[in-house]
Amino acid sequence: MAKVGFMSLGCPKNLVDSEVMLGHLKLKGYTITHRMEEAEILVVNTCGFIESAKAESIEAILEAASMKQKGACRKLVVAGCMVERYREQLLADMPEIDACLGTRDIEHIAEVIGADDRLFEPERDPAYLYDEHSPRLLTSPGASAYLKISEGCDHACAFCAIPSIRGPQRSRTPESIEAEARQLVAQGILEVNLVGQDTTDYGRDFGDPDALEKLVRRLGTVEGLRWFRIHYSYPNRLTDGLLRAMAETGNCVKYLDLPLQHADARVLKTMARGGGRSTFMKLLGKVRRTVPGVFVRSNFIVGFPSETEASFADLRDFVEEARFEHVGVFTYSPEEGTPAFGLGDPVPERTKQKRKRILMELQQKISRAKNRALEGQVLEVLVEGRHEETELIFKGRHQGQAPEVDGGVLIVGGEPEENTLQPVRITKGHAYDLVGEVVEGGTEAAVRAFEARRRTGGAGHA
């Protein structure tokens, strides 16, 4: 069978889609190659969320098209979010594309590759969800993987095109999620990252607003699942029961990904999100009281059409007061088909970049102070391997650092075993990364600490 090369862009949810498509292709007998120049078929799984992501996707398609002209490639398939938004335009403007595949068609990847008609569209099941029976080929290195618990979104945030791309909320059953978690553990995975457009909305489509709380407790019973974390939560969906479940479930890491997008009430109202600075501070207080030792990450958008100097100042003051462990900042880009598109783009790009820089510099100071406060503490660290720049240093992450976005722990001295959890004493805290050394006793000490935490629901750092 033909060799297939994959380029996967965008968020972890898109990565899961790519892994499912790879699983289907492998099941059909295709050979998967990491050497793109050898691939006879190239698949580009695109992201179309914001302007910069679209530009990156177009660049990847053009790169693949160049390989098609010069290399072994004879067929170029474009998949993902950009196809859902711009299928006809892509096919019209880029004759190099041989076929397109939308986000709700991923189980038909082999069928699309085998079709002769570039306009071929498989019969669509709008309720399609991958599950524990779907073939999936993991591409994440090491002992960490993503697990998508739902697809689609029922929110109507003014800036966001995701509901039109991914469709309405569709939750997997808890039995299916638990089964896949057990499959991942059997493949050597220690850390599972739960993802969805809004994980805290999980289960509401089948009538259970407490479904995520129950799922957390359910995953707490999975033997060998050392860590799992919740990404993409929504502020008004954080129930007391969910927070208690996080605090009381030993292998649920004390980490919360809570994208708030802004803090000024007027801007949030224009975003169709609601809330505001005082509401969010009360929420953060409750989170930190209920889940002691929790690490909180948030994301914010600067330069939204209704953002004035005063409303940005409100956001800046909130970030300073809230003292998050991690913050991401994005500049607003108007997206066709969203309610905010009609508001135009009145904030100059230069102003957006300045505001982003101000927030990031502020957060750097906060993160540095928080990381320095960890000096001398022993943290459980997932050792991911040797550092790319030197074999003398190993890299890893502690519970408060999600994959790819939150920095890491640089482990100096010794030879810690890769893809294991090790107790590491922090010797130095920087703005993004920590430096530490493995505590004598290594793996045995880590196992004892893990068992104690499972019994008590402890926070995982001393």
Where are these predicted regions, by residue range?
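Proteins enriched for Cys/Gly/acidic motifs involved in redox and nucleic-acid/cofactor modification
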Residues: M1-Y202, G241, C252, L256, ...
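Conserved strand-turn element in the central/C-terminal portion of the radical SAM core barrel
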Residues: L9, A156, C160-G167, W227-N236, ...
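Conserved glycine-rich "GG(E/T)P / GGGxP" loop and the immediately following alpha-helix
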Residues: G48-A53, I189-K214, R218-V222, Y234-G241, ...
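Short acidic/polar active-site loop segments enriched in Thr and Asp
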Residues: D98, L190, R226, E325, ...
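Conserved, mostly hydrophobic/aromatic
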Residues: C157, I177, L194, I230, ...
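Radical SAM/AdoMet-radical enzyme domain recognition
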Residues: A186, E213-K214, R218-V222, W227-F228, ...
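Short, electropositive alpha-helical surface patch
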Residues: G207-G220, D240-K254, E307-F324, E349-K354, ...
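Terminal RNA-binding accessory module
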Residues: G342-A462
